[in-house]
């Protein structure tokens, strides 16, 4: 009997989101692609909350753009090697909530396709990226508040220092996912929407 996958695939077609994983290209703070693929996964509980967030955003005539979700341990190690900054980058020795599949990085997109101005790019590791940084203009603060409202209503918690990062409550109680074993299961799972991309 085939084991059930510990994470669920997130796709634009199945979840009505936009997906642009920032670590699948060199356009991130490391200057190189960290992922070998562009597959997006979440823990089932986080996936259920994401669906609620999608519905909440739709009521505001907005869409969610997913920038990162499940992150393999080796990817976390690569990020830490470049920026060992607790509070912004999780120490891989302790484990990232992304590696548990219960954290997601994302932003909002307007009906015209424009990404809302959040004041800083993702992975800006300064005070300006903090959720309630007072130095941003009113429009930026409103946009961040919209994202916060959508995600809190869906059951996520925010990261005080990263406006883009949300995670399940008690996230660190979830087990870390063995990425090699997981991706092997994905490749073998003929029913997974992600299988064709592996």
Model-identified regions with their sequence ranges:
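Segments that shape or occlude catalytic/ligand-binding pockets
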Residues: 72
